[in-house]
Amino acid sequence: MKRKTENVVPPYSPMCAPWTSPIGGSKERAGIDRSGKSHYNTEGYFVGNSAAERGLRSAREEKKMKSFDVAIDGPSGAGKSSLARRCAAELGLLYVDTGAIYRTVGLAALRRGVDRKDETAVAAILPELEIQMAYEDGEQRMYLNGEDVSREIRMPEISMCASDVSAHAAVRSFLLEMQRKLARENCVIMDGRDIGTVVLPEAKLKIYLTASPEARADRRMKELVAKGVEQPYEEVLRDIIQRDEQDMNREVAPLRQAEDAVLVDTTEIDFDESFRLLCGIIRERMEAEA
């Protein structure tokens, strides 16, 4: 399995034009490469004859022959995104950060001034949203109605906005097919809150990644400092505990460990050790499935 993935140009490879998956108001499945030209047909498939384009088609054909999907769930600040992104790059898989998608909807609700806890109000703005997820130079970026909001959705206040809107069945239904389509067409590492329990219940490997609230708050503080954002530690810890409570107790798709998920607790280990552990678990399962 490993040999095959190394010989395929991943969909997010820097040598490829950005892959995009739009949802919402526009039905046009199109992506824009660095030259500004559209290279995606109405089914969302990349077309063309360059080496990179042939690589993308090969990746799709490989997906049809052998499916391998990794579902990673866990609480806020557990390191899901950073670890999953690095593991995906190491193993030649497509990384999908579903939390970024919900953050984008949360940002839209905040900008429009709607009551984020009112499902009817939030559902009313969904048809107006066109959300695109693009891979540019190996990084996932989020676009809201054509605007790059990748940085804005990482602001601390957007975390609770995402938690609020993700509690609504209308929002989860709105985004569910997009997530499943990505997994159908690619070998993915997808992280979120309900990937192994709802989105990809048949995933080849499920992992529940967690750490203590205090450890997660420490890590979040370092991220914020690196971004030049000032926020008291006590406030960061309170937000994490509040987010946990809300995510675990919502009626729709609550955060929980799937029965067949591998539990990985990173409280006492650093990022590099966590990466080696997680990557080892995934590689072992990939080889077993080959």
PLM-predicted stretches and their roles:
Residues 72:
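Hydrophobic anchor at the beta1->P-loop junction of P-loop NTPases
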Residues 83:
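Hydrophobic positions on the alpha1 helix immediately C-terminal to the Walker A/P-loop
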